[in-house]
C-alpha cells in the first residue's frame, strides 16, 4: 500500500461529502414543483389586483375592515436566529427587548424554536410573547427532534384566526403563517414567511415559493402585509415578483443590508396596493444575525 494512502482517504471522504451535498442541492432546485401550492379559494366578492405592463394598477380589489387612522401602523419583521439560544441563554430576552424598544403593532418572526435542543428545550415563542406583553400565534414549519421550528406573529391587538400553509420545497420544509389580525379597530391579513436559503443554489425553489405566496395574498379579504426572510437580494429574479410592494421602495428608504454577515438585504416588508408607507428602515442591532426591519404605514383607500 502507498505511503500516502492515509492522507488520500480523508481527502476522498471530504470530496464525497461535498459531491453528495452538490447533488442534493441540484436535485432540490430542479425537482421542486409549484403544484404543491394550495391557496384558499378566492372570495368572489373580492376583485383581484392587476397591473398593466408599465406597472400601473388597472383593477382594484375591494378591501374591507380598515377605519381612518389617527397614527401609522408600525410593523416589524425579524429573523431572530433562534438557535443562538444554545450559546446565549438570554437570547430570547434580548430579542424581546429590541421589540419592546421600537413598540411595533405587528411583528413577524422567523426561525422560532419550540422545545428543540438548540433552545435548551424551551418554548421560545411563549417566552418572547410573555416578555413583550403581546398577543400572537406560533406556526410550525416542521418537527425537529421532538420540538418544532417555524414562524410566529406578535401583535398589540388580537389574532382573530391563523393557519399555516406549506410552501413548495424539497429538503428543509418551508411555510407561510397567515393570520387575520385586529388592531385599533382595523382588520388585516398578515403573512409571515421564511423562504429556502443557500443563496443561488435554490433561486428556482424560492421563485416557486414566491409564486405561491402571490397566490395566497391575492385571496386576502382584508388589506395585507407580507413579512419575512426571503433569502434573496432586491435585484434577484424571485424578489422582483413583489418589487412594487416593497415598503422600502414605496417610501424611498435606502435599506442596503439586513444580514450583516452576508452584506445583503434579504428581509422585507411587502405591502398591499392600498398602503401608503411613511417610513422604513433596518435597525442595526446585534441580537440576531439579521437586522429587524420596521415600517410605518397608513391605509390610503378609505
Provide a role label for each language-model segment:
Residues 48-50, 72-93, 113-117, 196-205:
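Acidic/histidine-rich helix-loop elements
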Residues 4-15, 24-64, 164, 215-225, ...:
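Metal-dependent phosphoester-hydrolase catalytic domains
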Residues 87-91, 99, 104, 120, ...:
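Extracytoplasmic/periplasmic, Sec-exported soluble proteins
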